[in-house]
């Protein structure tokens, strides 16, 4: 069975990138639980790279959809993009790349199944894109994103991927003459490397759904799902102030 270094080598070969600074790749694969358990070493986790990669991802997919789907209007493009860059899609790509096996992760997080947790995998893929952007530039990072995400577009259009409840909820509200919904984090529990979030979705200041998850994105999706299940949501949307 390959050890951690062998797995990292396999990942490098899979990516086909001649890294100028391999430290960026290491940082992209470093989960906050690892730096928490080894904080005396002054290591940096992948959260800042994740922030950067998120922006790269949105631009790359937006550009690709704009060029490849000329028949779609702005609303359809936005909905499709949201489904492509959502957590389940990114986690699926991360599994294809076997990022979970390469992560530097704390022992506690690993014991709790962190290597296959969708939120962690999705964040790692975004961090990887951030690292590639800094090391190789936007064109290379965007190319990597599209290489793995473009095949999922057909799956999204044919309903083979998990639903994006946040987009569905906003569309429902807008179709019925409503306003934007708002998401708030109601509660955070646990240490930084092992948090649980509770999110609420508000419509005109009223809490219409609540959900929990291991990431803010997951919690918000669950809150939107709960809101969509409410039979009285439609009448609330139709009620004008």
Swiss-Prot record:
PROSITE patterns assigned to the protein according to its UniProt record, in alphabetical order: DS_RBD, RNASE_3_1, RNASE_3_2
One Pfam family per UniProt: dsrm
Protein's UniProt name: Ribonuclease 3
Similarity comment: family membership: Belongs to the ribonuclease III family.
SMART domains per the UniProt record, alphabetical: DSRM, RIBOc
Originating organism: Pelotomaculum thermopropionicum (strain DSM 13744 / JCM 10971 / SI)
Cofactor(s) the protein requires to work: Mg(2+)
Intracellular or extracellular location(s): Cytoplasm
InterPro entries xrefs: dsRBD_dom (IPR014720), RNase_III (IPR011907), RNase_III_dom (IPR000999), RNase_III_sf (IPR036389)
Catalytic residue list: 54, 126
Keywords, alphabetical: Cytoplasm, Endonuclease, Hydrolase, Magnesium, Metal-binding, mRNA processing, Nuclease, RNA-binding, rRNA processing, rRNA-binding, tRNA processing
Chemical reaction(s) catalysed: Endonucleolytic cleavage to 5'-phosphomonoester
Region named Disordered: 214-241
EC number: 3.1.26.3
Cross-referenced SUPFAM superfamilies: dsRNA-binding domain-like, RNase III domain-like
Function: Digests double-stranded RNA. Involved in the processing of primary rRNA transcript to yield the immediate precursors to the large and small rRNAs (23S and 16S). Processes some mRNAs, and tRNAs when they are encoded in the rRNA operon. Processes pre-crRNA and tracrRNA of type II CRISPR loci if present in the organism.
GO MF: double-stranded RNA binding; metal ion binding; ribonuclease III activity; rRNA binding
Subcellular location, principal: cytoplasm
HAMAP family tied to this protein: RNase_III
Entry GO terms, CC: cytoplasm
Residues at which Mg(2+) binds: 50, 123, 126
GO biological process, one term: tRNA processing
Boundaries of every DRBM domain copy: 164-233
The keyword Glycosyltransferase appears for this protein: no
RNase III domain segment(s): 8-137
């Amino acid at each position: 069975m390959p050890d951690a270094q062998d797995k990292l080598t396999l990942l490098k070969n899979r990516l086909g990138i001649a890294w100028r600074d391999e430290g960026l790749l290491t940082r992209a694969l470093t989960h906050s639980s690892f730096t928490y358990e080894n904080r005396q070493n002054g290591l940096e986790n992948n959260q800042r790279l994740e922030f950067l990669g998120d922006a790269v991802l949105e631009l790359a997919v937006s550009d690709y959809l704009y060029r490849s789907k000329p028949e779609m209007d702005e609303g359809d493009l936005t909905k499709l993009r949201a489904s492509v860059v959502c957590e389940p899609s990114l986690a699926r790509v991360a599994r294809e790349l076997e990022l979970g096996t390469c992560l530097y992760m704390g022992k506690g997080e690993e014991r709790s199944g962190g290597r296959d947790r969708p939120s962690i995998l999705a964040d790692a893929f975004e961090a990887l894109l951030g690292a590639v952007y800094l090391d190789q530039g936007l064109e290379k990072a965007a190319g990597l994103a599209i290489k793995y995400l473009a095949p999922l577009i057909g799956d999204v259009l044919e309903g083979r991927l998990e639903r994006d409840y946040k987009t569905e909820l906003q569309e429902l509200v807008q179709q019925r003459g409503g306003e934007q919904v708002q998401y708030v984090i109601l509660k955070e529990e646990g240490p930084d490397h092992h948090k649980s979030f509770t999110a609420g979705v508000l419509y005109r200041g009223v809490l219409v759904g609540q959900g929990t998850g291991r990431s803010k994105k997951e919690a918000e999706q669950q809150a939107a799902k709960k809101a969509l299940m409410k039979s009285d949501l439609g009448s609330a949307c139709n009620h004008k102030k």
